[in-house]
């Protein structure tokens, strides 16, 4: 089947363009909307405050000027970006009692969401590679994970994530939407928009499948293999304190990986379902709100260096100047 055929609308469909979508949101009862507003506002403030605090600690604390914390600082930026793409717009709709989003704004939200989510995939992989070198090859670690290598890994991650997000957005822009225009979600995402298209989504679903293999399966396999080597190396450490410290740094990362990939698999591996459900909204909340809010807690609670840097930052022993 040709590329042109895949992008053609189905015969007999009305080709009238949809100018805006209606996002049904998390709840549709007016009584619950103030509660949802307060909870989302609280989550947004906690997430931005927590992640920006970790970023500030990484920048000002010399102990944290190491590759692992360089990647952690980047992860904090991503977490702030991820929740900012969805939550402020939803808060605005709750305040204005308007649930519409323009077609262009919907595509923009789709692009930035997949840009940041894709970057998350590659950054978590880079963090696993960092732990692999630090624990399994400590003698060459400083050379193989130099500042140049760190920056190259982050730059390559941004380039791959940008390419993926742009591909999905351009492919989505080729679809025809002729009604209905109600999105059973609180932000614009691929599976929900596929269900509203009156043209074929075969190409889009194929692209999503290929992207999942490249950006989810391959990184997850690499992370799993890396940590298998890490566990084998840690078990050979004779010092109980050394084993505990190694497992604590790796445990935080594995927890974040498990939550991130678990929610991602549930969201994008269910394209055969006929319609969106409240489960999709729950997973969406986990991906865009809970994950970014939990990440700083997961890393700070299990890492004494981060805890110490945050305490120094909060009591004012160090300043950003």
From Swiss-Prot:
Matching entries from CDD domains are given as:
7tmA_OR3A-like
Q: Which GO terms describe its molecular function?
A: G protein-coupled receptor activity; olfactory receptor activity
Tell me if Transferase is a UniProt keyword of this record. no
Q: Which GO terms describe its biological process?
A: signal transduction
Location(s), subcellular: Cell membrane
Instruction: List the keywords (alphabetical).
Output: Cell membrane, Disulfide bond, G-protein coupled receptor, Glycoprotein, Membrane, Olfaction, Receptor, Sensory transduction, Transducer, Transmembrane, Transmembrane helix
Q: Tell me the residue ranges located in the Cytoplasmic compartment per UniProt.
A: 59-66, 130-149, 229-245, 302-321
Q: Which residues lie on this side of the membrane: Extracellular?
A: 1-34, 89-109, 168-205, 269-281
Purpose: Odorant receptor.
Name under which the protein is recorded = Olfactory receptor 3A3
What organism does this protein naturally occur in?
Homo sapiens
